[in-house]
Amino acid sequence: MAEIRKLKNYINGEWVESKTDQYEDVINPATKEVMCQVPISTREDVEYAVRSASEAFQTWSKTAVPRRARILFNYQQLLQQNKEELARLITLENGKNTTEALGEVGRGIENVEFAAGAPSLMMGDSLASIATDVEAANYRYPIGVVGGIAPFNFPMMVPCWMFPMAISLGNTFILKPSERTPLLTEKLAELFEQAGLPKGVFNVVHGAHDVVNGVLEHPDIKAISFVGSKPVGEYVFKKGSEHLKRVQALTGAKNHTIVLNDAHLEDTVTNIIGAAFGSAGERCMACAVVTVEEGIADEFMAKLQEKAADIKIGNGLDDGVFLGPVIREDNKKRTHSYIEKGIEEGARLLCDGRENATEDGYFVGPTIFDNVTTDMTIWKDEIFAPVLSVIRVKNLKEAVDIANQSEFANGACLFTSNANAIRYFRENIDAGMLGINLGVPAPMAFFPFSGWKSSFFGTLHANGKDSVDFYTRKKVVTARYPSPDFN
């Protein structure tokens, strides 16, 4: 048997062994194959990374902005040239199909492209005359060393929300990727080095609780970007804030999709199938609940079940596969327990994903419940799996009222051809990202990823102008220039 490779941390431009003696298997969720082992690093590893990032900040923060932008542009080109390999790594580690993985790579590259616009993004503003012979100007500066804590479900896109922008704006960065998907991060670091990034500007420390707490508590780390579950996100926000850091924590979701009687049924069902079961439902923008008007409900449910039955389940590397595995055995068991809870609490199970499980991987098939009510566990909790709940409603107002009862408010979608309904939905739904006649309302890089309520803790969101404000601080200079006598 070949020896299993042990991954290293990437600190100060070098691949270095962790100080730990603890390693965790990195498993292909479609085959249960152990691909490598990732170190569960120590606070000593974090300390070394912070020291390296702090030293690098002294020169990187003063590097000319166009020079930083050129390195980001080089990085974008290298990512584009290696997109097939990046997608393959995502599928091997995460399980999503190749098409979805390529889409994720594209969204990650999009964020690098946006970050490469640093010369424009870093611009301040000025007022030539605020009083006699007095002018004022506002300048942006990087804030220092930034920490990022990323999840397993989007191992490229989510880190690319964080480190390209932070680095382009003059900060240095320490990334803790998910210990379940570290191989993609290894490739991201290799390509960034090839792009010409100086040592210490970007660092990767693998691990779990000790690394997270080390990042949250270290006085030389000035800001934290986090994406993950609500309980962990709330902890990160509180702990980081306690240590006087800027924190943005993007957390859980229970996204509702509303289908009105005038919706184009075929397109609506196709969109919802993709939104509910794409990426095995393991995404914070997944459609978790459909509220459908009674007039179209029976026809909608028939088409939904028909399309769900046609979904091909399997290894994401295989041709034609739509639905890959969930990430681990524990996630599979947790999903099964939610299915059992839904049945126990009175929901009607129309498609049972347990029937599609195989011994080869952590597979759960598309699962659909009808006649769900808001007192049921499957409506309340974020399941993070290919499980869809359907509620039948009398009208749009009832659908919006139901969605607004959720503690989460990440995204919401509406399918209709009625302009008045769209306006009512936009003005009354409690959610930060809305979709009209589309299933996944995730914005592009130049708009903020803006969840509400328990879907976000902080003030400045990821992406868009919010990210520029989050990773910079401002200095206002007011100057008096007495009028000279040129006569």
Swiss-Prot record:
Keywords associated with the record: NAD, Oxidoreductase
GO biological process: inositol catabolic process; thymine catabolic process; valine catabolic process
Highest taxon listed in the record's lineage: Bacteria
Residues annotated for NAD(+) binding in this entry: A150, F152, K176, E179, R180, S229, T251, E382
Listed pathway(s): Polyol metabolism; myo-inositol degradation into acetyl-CoA; acetyl-CoA from myo-inositol: step 7/7
Entry similarity comment: Belongs to the aldehyde dehydrogenase family. IolA subfamily.
HAMAP family: IolA
UniProt name for this protein: Malonate-semialdehyde dehydrogenase
